[in-house]
């Protein structure tokens, strides 16, 4: 048995056996490289197979302030030696200064038979962080300082909680004793008196000293003066600029420890200039925001950016340029390379949410600054944890949308092209349903899709408004918007009025298009009308005789064209006039690519549909419904300015996608979105013979049987005919409707069924560690975020020794 160093007492003593020698060397290197404990005297003590314990060894143990026991299999064997165990029991007492590190040995109640105070030892494991090892040693040394025994506030055998389960202590002060240090910043070359206030009573009969330990120069001890039982004053020595460790000694015991800083005049000027050049304060002063308020500035900048963005938004150009490969090469040698980094640093939450909807947002998100930090880590570094969470969830939601589309549409040879197109078509869904639910232009342009009866007048007014209003960013005037809302709300009620007016003609089969009376006046020439919209079916009794003075609207539209081309290869115009009324068979799709999220209505669309149903049922009239909708829009606009409101909407969208994925996994189906039949005004239409617009006779198939189409069935196993595959896709697209099963996914009153945890996609590691130490590179460093280099270099810990029997 031997101890390295002179056995006259030490601060840290490491006890080990030969099988834990590598761990002993690692801890020595760790403690010597740590600024917090490297000034302490460190010795090691080896217990070999034939070890003996002398009185000199026992004296060394008793004079040590912290004993680190590397509990390995060979060391445990010494506990079974009757001659050695009593000496070890005395050496490992009192328990508050003993720290055990389990090296290949599990904790067991058997050790209580050897050491009654076993439960009071601090316990560490091989998986703990290096900072935990240092903090545990600091805790043992601090408790051995004697302050607790002076005040007698705690019993000596008080249980010490395992430090591996506690949070790391801050690097500024030692726990318990220090209260205040004034001043904590000292100008180089100036004579300054430092006052230290502690919690424990000091004995003025014992010599009190202060030790100043710069990082790059030897330590300096100065005699301190005890002003009273709790206050010490000391003259600060003249040191170079930088951080200096300050320790207060009462005799040979360390009372407290803290860190102060020395600065030069030029460094102070630099600090003043950096504070004066704070961009947030500068902008608050420029915009006359007094007192300085970051939230007010955030709203002002957000509104300014919104006013300079087109009304329909920039999301049309897409935002999914997330760099997924070789992200470390996408690093800039700047502190704030993009506006997104700037908004994240200063906590401009609303501006950040708006920037995420702009083109290139995710590309900017994947750019690291000169320190290797990304916008989300920058936000957390400066204390904006809610903003960090919002950015992470937004990026995850975009990735979820892309993955969901990819799973649904990537089938066959055209998978790549379809996926790229769908990725761009569905990016605006994220903004409409989560970040900007009250987008007027998207709302008005989509009204016609829900009320085919009012599409003609709506199309005409929209065209007139767009041609007569050249102001950019204002596609429709307020009068036009009010008129469109009124016509939308009157859609079903007008249809009911026409039915009541024509009750005398029961049994009459009307055309699917509007019929125009001869005495009605039209302000727009029929030849200049836009294309005929989807017809509106009416519920009338079949077999009725049609009035001779009513002429189908379709004939007026194609009147001039039929004169220029008198005959048609399939059927003549006379047969169309004299034949029975027909319902067109839609062979052409409405869009070239199917969007699985097309049926997901925005909050504004749902509100309009709700008011329309109330008007139809007579609960409110049209004027009241218009006022209710305007009030809802105003309230929605005020709420949308709230960052919390945007967080809630984003969470609803995420929960909707997550719920669909979970339902898909439970059911085992290939897809979770079903294509339904378009909504009709009457849900109970009788089965009728179908006619084509250009066909003289009925089709053989009356109404095709309703089958549930799944995207797994879009392409069958038969690939011999290209036409069959094309027809299959065409027939699928022809069943597009405004209700594809996603209407209730983003309701305001929706209760999320799934709480999704944060995925590890975005970089989650902040570049600023809580301590100045870094974990030894036992695990390869993460590629997404690199820690800045520090002055301390640690070696990886050795492997864990094999477990004993």
Curated annotation (Swiss-Prot):
Biased composition (Pro residues): 795-805
UniProt note on tissues of expression: Expressed in natural killer (NK) cells.
Entry PTM: Constitutively phosphorylated. Phosphorylated on tyrosine residues in C-terminal region by ABL1. Phosphorylated on tyrosine residues within the YXXM motifs by BTK and SYK. Isoform 1 and isoform 2 are phosphorylated on tyrosine residues, most likely within the YXXM motifs, via CD19 activation. Toll-like receptor activation induces appearance of a phosphorylated form associated with membranes.
Keyword terms, alphabetized: Cell membrane, Coiled coil, Cytoplasm, Membrane, Phosphoprotein
Cystine pairings recorded for this chain: none
Amino acid composition bias (Low complexity), ranges on this chain: 717-740
SMART domains tied to this protein: DBB (SM01282)
Alphabetical list of Pfam families matching this protein: DBB, TIR_3
InterPro entries attached to this UniProt entry: B-cell_PI3K-Signaling_Adptrs, DBB_domain, PIK3AP1_TIR, TIR_dom, Toll_tir_struct_dom_sf
Domain DBB: 181-317
Function of the molecule: Signaling adapter that contributes to B-cell development by linking B-cell receptor (BCR) signaling to the phosphoinositide 3-kinase (PI3K)-Akt signaling pathway. Has a complementary role to the BCR coreceptor CD19, coupling BCR and PI3K activation by providing a docking site for the PI3K subunit PIK3R1. Alternatively, links Toll-like receptor (TLR) signaling to PI3K activation, a process preventing excessive inflammatory cytokine production. Also involved in the activation of PI3K in natural killer cells. May be involved in the survival of mature B-cells via activation of REL.
Description of its domains: The DBB domain is required for dimerization.
Subunit relationships: Homooligomer. Interacts (phosphorylated on tyrosine residues within YXXM motifs) with PIK3R1 (via SH2 domain); required for BCR- and TLR-mediated activation of phosphoinositide 3-kinase. Interacts (via polyproline C-terminal region) with ABI1 (via SH3 domain); the interaction promotes phosphorylation of PIK3AP1 by ABL1. May interact with MYD88 and TIRAP.
Protein name: Phosphoinositide 3-kinase adapter protein 1
Source organism of this protein record: Homo sapiens (Human)
Lineage summary: Eukaryota, Metazoa, Chordata, Craniata, Vertebrata
């Amino acid at each position: 048995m031997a101890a390295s160093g002179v056995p006259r007492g030490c601060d840290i003593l490491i006890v080990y056996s030969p099988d834990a020698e590598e761990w002993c060397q690692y801890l020595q290197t760790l403690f010597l490289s740590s600024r917090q404990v490297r000034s302490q005297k460190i010795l090691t003590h080896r217990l070999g197979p034939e070890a003996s314990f002398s009185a000199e060894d026992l004296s060394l143990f008793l004079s040590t302030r912290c004993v680190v026991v590397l509990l390995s299999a060979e060391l445990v064997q010494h506990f079974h030696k009757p001659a050695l165990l009593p000496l070890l029991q005395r050496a490992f007492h009192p328990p508050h200064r003993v720290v055990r590190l389990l090296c290949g040995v599990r904790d067991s109640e058997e050790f209580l038979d050897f050491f009654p105070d076993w439960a009071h030892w601090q316990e560490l494991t091989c998986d703990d962080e290096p900072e935990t090892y240092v903090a545990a040693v600091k805790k043992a040394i601090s408790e051995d300082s004697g302050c607790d025994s002076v005040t007698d506030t705690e019993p000596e055998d008080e249980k010490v909680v395992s430090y591996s389960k506690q949070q790391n202590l801050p690097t500024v002060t030692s726990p318990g004793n220090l209260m205040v240090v004034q001043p904590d910043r000292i100008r180089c070359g100036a004579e300054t008196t430092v006052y230290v206030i502690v919690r424990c009573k000091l004995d003025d009969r014992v010599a009190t000293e202060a030790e100043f330990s710069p990082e790059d120069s030897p330590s300096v001890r100065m005699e301190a003066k005890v002003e009273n039982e709790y206050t010490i004053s000391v003259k600060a020595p003249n040191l170079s600029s930088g951080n200096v460790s300050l320790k207060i000694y009462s005799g040979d015991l360390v009372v407290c420890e803290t860190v102060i800083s020395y600065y030069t005049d030029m460094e102070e000027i630099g600090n003043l200039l950096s504070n004066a050049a704070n961009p947030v304060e500068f902008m608050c002063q420029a915009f006359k925001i007094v007192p300085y308020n970051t939230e007010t500035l955030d709203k002002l900048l957000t509104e300014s950016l919104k006013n300079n963005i087109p009304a329909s938004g920039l999301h049309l150009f897409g935002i999914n340029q997330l760099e997924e490969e070789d992200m470390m090469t996408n690093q800039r040698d700047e502190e704030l390379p993009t506006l997104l980094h700037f908004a994240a640093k200063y906590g401009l939450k609303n501006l950040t949410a708006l920037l995420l909807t702009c083109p290139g947002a995710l590309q900017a998100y994947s750019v690291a600054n000169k320190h290797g930090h990304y916008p989300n880590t920058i936000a957390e570094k400066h204390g904006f944890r809610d903003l960090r969470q919002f950015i992470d969830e937004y990026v995850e939601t975009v990735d979820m949308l892309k993955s969901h589309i990819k799973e649904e549409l990537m089938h066959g040879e055209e998978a790549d092209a379809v996926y790229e197109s769908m990725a761009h078509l569905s990016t605006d869904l994220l903004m409409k349903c989560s970040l900007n639910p009250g987008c007027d232009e998207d709302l008005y342009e989509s009204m016609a899709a829900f009320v085919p009866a009012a599409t003609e007048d709506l199309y005409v007014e929209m065209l007139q408004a767009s041609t007569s209003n050249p102001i950019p960013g204002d596609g429709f005037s307020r009068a036009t918007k009010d008129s469109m809302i009124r016509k939308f709300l009157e859609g079903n009620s007008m249809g009911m009025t026409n039915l009541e007016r024509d009750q005398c003609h029961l049994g009459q089969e009307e055309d699917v298009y509007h019929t125009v009376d001869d005495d009605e006046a039209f302000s727009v020439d029929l030849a200049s009308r836009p294309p005929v919209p989807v017809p509106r079916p009416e519920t009338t009794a079949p077999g009725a005789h049609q009035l001779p003075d009513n002429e189908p609207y379709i004939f007026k539209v194609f009147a001039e064209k039929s004169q220029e081309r008198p005959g048609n290869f399939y059927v003549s115009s006379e047969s169309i006039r004299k034949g029975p009324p027909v319902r067109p068979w839609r062979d052409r799709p409405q869009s070239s690519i199917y969007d699985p999220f097309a049926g997901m209505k925005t909050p504004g669309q749902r509100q309009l549909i709700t008011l329309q149903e109330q008007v139809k049922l007579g609960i409110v009239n049209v004027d009241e419904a218009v006022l209710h909708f305007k009030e809802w829009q105003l309230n929605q606009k005020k709420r949308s300015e709230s960052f919390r409101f945007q967080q809630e909407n984003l969470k609803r969208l995420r929960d909707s996608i997550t719920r669909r994925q979970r339902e898909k996994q439970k059911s085992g189906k290939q897809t979770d979105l079903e294509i339904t039949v378009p909504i009709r005004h009457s849900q109970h239409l009788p089965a009728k013979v179908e006619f084509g617009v250009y066909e003289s006779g009925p089709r053989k198939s009356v109404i095709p049987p309703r089958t549930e189409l799944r995207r797994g069935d879009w392409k069958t196993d038969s690939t011999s005919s290209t036409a069959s595959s094309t027809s299959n896709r065409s027939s699928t697209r022809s069943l597009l409707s405004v209700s594809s099963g996603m209407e209730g996914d983003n309701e305001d009153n929706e209760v999320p069924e799934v709480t999704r945890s944060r995925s590890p996609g975005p970089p989650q590691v902040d570049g600023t560690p809580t301590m100045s130490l870094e974990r030894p590179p036992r695990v390869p460093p993460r590629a997404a975020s690199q820690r800045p280099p520090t002055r301390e270099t640690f070696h990886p810990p050795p492997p864990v020794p094999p477990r004993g029997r």
